[in-house]
A protein has these predicted regions:
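Short acidic (Asp/Glu) and glycine-rich catalytic loops that position anionic groups and cofactors
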Residues: 65-66, 87, 130-135, 168-171, ...
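Alpha-helical cores of eukaryotic small-GTPase signaling modules
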Residues: 118-140, 145-146
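C-terminal substrate/ligand-recognition segments
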Residues: 108, 113, 136-182
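Short, well-ordered loop/turn and helix-capping segments at boundaries between secondary-structure elements
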Residues: 103, 112, 116, 160, ...
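C-terminal, helix-dominated tail/subdomain
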Residues: 126-132, 190-248
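Glycine/tryptophan-enriched, flexible segments
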Residues: 1-126, 233-248
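Short, hydrophobic/aromatic alpha-helical segments in well-folded domains
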Residues: 71, 86-89, 97, 106, ...
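Extended hydrophobic-aromatic, low-complexity segments
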Residues: 164-167, 181-189, 199-204
Length: 248
């Protein structure tokens, strides 16, 4: 992060694209529809992003019951907003939020310089981990039926909306890798299938962080206690009760 900030230059964030449009060749090719590309419509709606929520991000970001995150992930993923514009807007507003954007850039650099991370551990010394890879337990994790409320709430939110709060992503990922001892690649692939904001670099980087196999990862002995996480971040069970109806 510190190295990134040292090299950060506002001038490089300003791209005068309008002045370059005249260089583009004009054509009248037919524009394909979604069906032509092999896509079908989904009832899941992509949320609008709201940068007003960035102001208190450092104070509210870990409370999943609050609608306090910007929801900008899908827009960054598909390029409907400019990362340069977002950085310029938030750099003096909330340093914690800026740090999250820097993490995104960091994981992209990791993927570029160390492409083996796509399907291998960043740290080869962890290649010998003996994963249990119990398929029935993995299925319960995917469906939000593990019996651990915080984990199940997160997975049900993901399955229903294509979104999961970042704090809950860490909890569910840690649970899969360090409680169930299921290979992080299984979880990464499931998130890739479900997340609206999925992009390879961040998804891979964060899963390897959770598993302890990444370049700047949570150590293997750091295990998120799903019960203690409730006490810290969802004490009133507001988030859990929203997504696990059978607990109400």
């Amino acid at each position: 992060k510190n190295r990134w900030l040292l090299r950060f230059n506002e001038t490089e964030c300003k791209v005068n694209t309008d002045s370059n449009f005249t260089n583009l060749k004009k054509s009248n090719y037919p524009f394909p529809n979604m069906e032509d590309l092999g896509f079908s419509s989904s009832p899941i709606q992509v949320p609008e992003f709201d940068l007003n929520k960035v102001v208190d991000y450092d104070k509210t970001r870990n409370i999943p019951s609050l609608d306090s995150t910007s929801k900008i992930g899908p827009h960054l993923r598909f390029g409907t907003v400019s990362i340069r514009e977002i950085v310029l807007k938030v750099k003096d507003v909330n340093s914690t939020y800026l740090s999250e954007l820097i993490w995104r850039e960091f994981f992209m650099q990791i993927l570029w310089h160390f492409p083996h991370v796509v399907n291998q551990n960043f740290r080869a010394k962890y290649n010998g981990i003996q994963w249990r890879n119990n398929e029935e337990e993995f299925k319960k994790w995917c469906n939000g039926e593990t019996g651990y409320p915080f984990v199940d709430a997160g997975m049900r939110e993901l399955n229903k909306t294509g979104f999961m709060h970042n704090r809950v992503r860490m909890i569910t990922a840690s649970f899969l890798c360090k409680h169930l001892l299921i290979d992080w690649r299984w979880g990464e692939a499931y998130f890739a299938k479900k997340l609206l904001d999925y992009e390879l670099a961040s998804n891979n980087g964060n899963w390897q962080w959770s598993a302890g196999t990444g370049c700047d990862a949570a150590p293997y002995f750091r295990v998120f206690n799903p019960s203690e996480q409730i006490k810290k971040f969802d004490k009133a069970h507001t988030y859990i009760n929203k997504w696990i109806e059978d607990l109400n």
